[in-house]
């Protein structure tokens, strides 16, 4: 049986075209703090760590260790991993804590080891697992923290990496909230022999991947001490990503300097403040409101399409939900 090449694409990989509303708009370099220019303390306050969670502790325990290590008031993680599961766990710090909400629509990727309870021909394994791509129906496991209602989830791709007897190693890209243990159970039923999950590792959470930004808890301890005790901030700075990393995949609306303070003071985003937008924004979409220096101002729900934002001269374009930028980064100009 020919093995088709798998296109590993998550929602976070979608490329978007930028549409410009005001070509003459500029930003004042005196205002704001672009991600690459933030002082170390500020970088940590508005940062997110691409943490390699070890098997053993719960996700909450890992976050608690990070808080204690850095003496933080707040921290949060994007997508709980069971204690035995390892891999990518984005941990947002202090003022960036609520940005993990932005990772929900981004998609996740795992590498799983499935153990079959009987012998199955390889061709059948490939054929049956291919059928699980697309919309599937799941009920959360008994031990899940959410109500056990039936719900649909999307499987973006399944790629078999290796088959060794009854063991099947595969990579899977899924919508947030998909239970891989349940997926494997149902694959086993479809194969007619039963199956269980032997091992699981998360390899992606939206824009956070197994790349040079992934750090272990041991790395963090070392890098933090290099900074605090030796004054060497280079390694610790690289270990913390700016919160803007967590919204890379979202459709964006860029606003002029004069509109920033109004949004940080609680106003929804009105059309006159818009300079450019991503193509394809639909009403109800979660969007990131950005400055012209690519600083994250807020997250909100689009109340207009991209086309309407470009064509209209007034009205509310984004219903702002969560504000991340401090009020004093840009001056009041109203």
Swiss-Prot record:
It holds the Pfam family PUA. Disulfide bonds: none annotated. Keywords: Isomerase, tRNA processing. It is an enzyme of class 5 (isomerase). It catalyses: uridine(55) in tRNA = pseudouridine(55) in tRNA. Its EC number is 5.4.99.25. GO terms for biological process: box H/ACA sno(s)RNA 3'-end processing; mRNA pseudouridine synthesis; rRNA pseudouridine synthesis; snRNA pseudouridine synthesis; tRNA pseudouridine synthesis. GO terms for molecular function: RNA binding; tRNA pseudouridine(55) synthase activity. Residues 250-325 form the PUA domain. InterPro entries: Dyskerin-like (IPR012960), PsdUridine_synth_cat_dom_sf (IPR020103), PsdUridine_synth_N (IPR002501), PUA (IPR002478), PUA-like_sf (IPR015947), PUA_sf (IPR036974), tRNA_PsdUridine_synth_B_fam (IPR004802), TruB_arch (IPR026326). The active site is at residue 82. Transmembrane segments: none annotated. Belongs to the pseudouridine synthase TruB family. Type 2 subfamily. Could be responsible for synthesis of pseudouridine from uracil-55 in the psi GC loop of transfer RNAs. This is Probable tRNA pseudouridine synthase B.
């Amino acid at each position: 049986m020919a093995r088709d090449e798998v296109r590993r694409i998550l929602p976070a990989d979608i490329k978007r075209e930028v549409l410009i509303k005001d070509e003459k708009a500029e930003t004042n370099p005196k205002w704001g703090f672009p991600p690459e220019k933030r002082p170390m303390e500020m970088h940590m306050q508005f940062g997110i760590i691409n943490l390699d969670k070890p098997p053993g502790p719960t996700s909450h325990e890992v976050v608690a260790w990070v808080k204690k290590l850095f003496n933080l008031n707040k921290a949060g993680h994007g997508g709980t991993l069971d204690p035995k599961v390892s891999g990518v766990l984005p941990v947002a710090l202090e003022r960036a804590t609520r940005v993990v909400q932005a990772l929900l629509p981004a998609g996740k990727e795992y590498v799983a080891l499935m153990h079959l309870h009987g012998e199955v021909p390889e061709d059948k394994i490939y054929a049956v697992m291919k059928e699980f791509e697309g919309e599937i129906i799941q009920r959360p496991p008994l031990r899940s923290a959410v109500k056990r209602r039936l719900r649909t989830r999307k499987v973006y791709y399944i790629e078999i990496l290796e088959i060794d007897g009854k063991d099947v190693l595969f990579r899977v890209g899924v919508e947030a909230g998909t239970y891989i243990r349940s997926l494997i159970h149902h694959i086993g039923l479809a194969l007619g022999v039963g199956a269980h999950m032997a091992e699981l590792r998360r390899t992606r959470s939206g824009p956070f991947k197994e790349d040079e930004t992934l750090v272990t808890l041991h790395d963090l301890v070392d890098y933090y001490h290099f900074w605090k005790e030796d004054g060497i901030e280079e390694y610790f700075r690289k270990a913390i990503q700016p919160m803007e990393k967590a919204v890379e995949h979202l459709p964006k609306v860029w606003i002029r300097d004069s509109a920033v303070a109004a949004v940080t003071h609680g106003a929804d985003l009105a059309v006159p403040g818009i300079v450019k937008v991503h193509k394809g924004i639909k009403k109800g979409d979660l969007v990131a409101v950005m400055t012209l220096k690519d600083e994250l101002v807020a997250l909100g729900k689009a109340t207009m399409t991209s086309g309407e934002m470009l064509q209209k001269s007034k009205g509310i374009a984004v219903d702002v939900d969560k504000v991340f930028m401090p009020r004093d980064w840009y001056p009041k100009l109203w």
